[in-house]
């Protein structure tokens, strides 16, 4: 199953100046629980935005899509299709696209599930957005609050209709 795991603001923003414009521990814990044991596909900038101590993401097959050779990345692939092939050849049934916007755009048509943390704020000067998708092709299967204090966060699971 291919899932996209993302946190976005109320306008769909996911980034500003190469970084995630919020810090929400509850969402980070959810991200870890969801992705551990599987394969994660990310772009070079997402790879480089990870703190050195978190790179590579532990207990996951880290696949970086890039035309270059990002420092410290063991598995660098030229396309999401090549990354999917490596993940499947390694026996991973759970594959998560974790950003950035180009990875989300490329994987969206192939994805079965969207795990979207809706962050109740609007990021000024955002420069990166999650792609829009046709909600008629998807069904909300789960919705729950990750965080009630501070910036409210709601996790919404969408499954592609068959």
Which sequence ranges carry the predicted segments?
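Enzymes that bind and transform nitrogen-containing heteroaromatic metabolites
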Residues: 1-162
């Amino acid at each position: 199953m291919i899932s996209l795991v993302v946190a976005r603001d109320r306008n769909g923003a996911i980034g500003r100046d190469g970084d995630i414009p919020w810090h929400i521990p509850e969402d980070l814990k959810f991200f870890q629980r969801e992705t551990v044991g599987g394969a994660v596909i990310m772009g070079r900038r997402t790879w480089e935005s990870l703190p050195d101590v978190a790179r590579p993401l532990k207990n996951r097959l880290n696949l970086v899509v890039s035309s270059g050779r990002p420092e410290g990345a063991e598995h660098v692939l030229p396309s999401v299709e090549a990354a999917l092939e490596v993940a499947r050849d390694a026996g991973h049934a759970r594959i998560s696209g974790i950003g950035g916007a180009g990875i989300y755009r490329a994987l969206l048509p192939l994805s079965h599930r969207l795990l979207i943390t809706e962050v109740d704020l609007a990021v000024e000067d955002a420069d990166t957005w999650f792609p829009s998708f046709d909600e008629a092709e998807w069904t909300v299967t789960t919705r729950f609050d990750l965080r009630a204090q501070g910036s409210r966060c709601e996790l919404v699971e969408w499954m592609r209709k068959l």
